[in-house]
């Protein structure tokens, strides 16, 4: 992996809030073993905003799902470590992991309409996230609580007030009225705000945002990103943003990781990655971005196609598409 030089010594010396060490997630298929995440490592500091950028199918979303141990069978996390506050999450029991998931590390999923339950009011779905982690008493639509959990229940009135404040904080207008409404009665932007409210309900230290603006128009995209930025500033919540939009990552994030074929190929501050990209793939992504300027410039698409993750070529996975590939690229990653 190409790493940009000159990163802050202070950042490297700080104890990271979240660290991935040689994380590998695989999926057995008829074509062979797909290494969706192929031994990646990164460090996330408290309060930091980190972007993971790459083409569709490169492993960005699987990386986030791996952090929360939400990989469905037959997929499995085959190796590495996921260290959160000095604990390896892969060593936790399923019960211990449930206490981390949604409370300490929460996730905003890509498609709000398929994530929200169409049968329950939005306000009750936000309240349920409090109930699952023992902060609230069960509402009328709550799921059964796992056995052996001790609830720290607040009064029902204060619970609803907390949900209403949260709905207001994420920009859901008239929260008292919207509390009883169902997901189909919300616009796409409001559905995404509801997902963010669910993720923030237990005041997590890390928020994983998987393409949070994909299905939204440009104006609503800007509002959602402004909301996430405000959450980061007001609450100190660390954010990992997954996106295919390099411009968006450059505007929103402090550091950027570029991912290709299950691997991190470049990592650095926004200035390092955007101003002085070292990996040919990063340079190719930047050349694909249309610019509004007086200078007329032809967009240069990256030739070829993303490799089959069940048959990634040896060496640098980008070599078959790279105009500057050398013989060493066929053997060295």
Q: Where is each model-derived feature located?
A:
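Conserved ABC transporter NBD signature motif
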Residues: 77-88
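P-loop NTP-binding/switch modules centered on Walker-like glycine-rich loops
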Residues: 55, 69, 208, 212, ...
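Short catalytic/signature loops enriched in Gly
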Residues: 15-16, 173-177, 269-333
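Conserved ABC ATPase signature
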Residues: 181-186, 190
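A short, proline-enriched helix->beta-strand linker immediately N-terminal to the Walker B motif
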Residues: 201-205
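Conserved ABC ATPase "signature" region
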Residues: 88, 142-151, 155-177, 230, ...
């Amino acid at each position: 992996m190409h790493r940009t030089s000159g990163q802050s010594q202070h950042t490297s010396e700080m104890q990271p809030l979240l660290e991935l060490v040689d994380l590998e997630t695989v999926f057995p298929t008829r074509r062979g073993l797909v290494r969706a995440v192929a031994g990646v490592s990164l460090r996330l500091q408290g309060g930091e905003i980190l972007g993971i950028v790459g083409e569709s199918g490169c492993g960005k979303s699987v990386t986030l799902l791996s952090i929360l141990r939400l990989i469905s069978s037959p997929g499995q996390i085959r190796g590495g470590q996921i260290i959160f506050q000095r604990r390896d999450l892969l060593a936790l029991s399923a019960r211990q992991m449930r206490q981390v998931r949604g409370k300490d590390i929460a996730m905003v999923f890509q498609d709000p309409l398929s994530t929200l339950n169409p049968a329950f009011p939005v306000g009750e779905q936000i309240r349920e996230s409090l109930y699952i982690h023992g902060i609230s008493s069960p509402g009328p639509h709550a799921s059964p609580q796992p056995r052996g959990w001790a609830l720290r229940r607040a009064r029902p009135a204060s619970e609803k007030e907390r949900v209403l404040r949260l709905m207001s904080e994420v920009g859901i207008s008239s929260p008292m009225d919207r509390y009883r409404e169902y997901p189909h009665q919300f616009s796409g932007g409001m559905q995404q705000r509801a997902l963010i409210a669910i993720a923030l309900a237990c005041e997590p230290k890390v928020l994983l945002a998987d393409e949070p603006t994909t299905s939204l128009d440009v104006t609503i995209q800007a509002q959602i990103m402004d909301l996430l930025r405000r959450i980061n500033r007001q609450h100190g919540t660390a954010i990992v943003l997954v996106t295919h939009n390099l411009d968006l990552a450059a505007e929103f994030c402090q550091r950027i990781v570029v991912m290709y074929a299950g691997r991190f190929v470049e990592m650095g501050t926004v200035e390092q990655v955007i101003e002085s990209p070292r990996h040919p793939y990063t340079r190719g992504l930047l050349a694909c971005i249309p610019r509004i300027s007086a200078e007329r410039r032809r967009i240069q698409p990256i030739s070829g196609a993303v490799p089959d993750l069940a048959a990634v070529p040896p060496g640098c996975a980008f070599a078959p598409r790279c105009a500057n590939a050398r013989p060493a690229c066929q053997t060295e990653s």
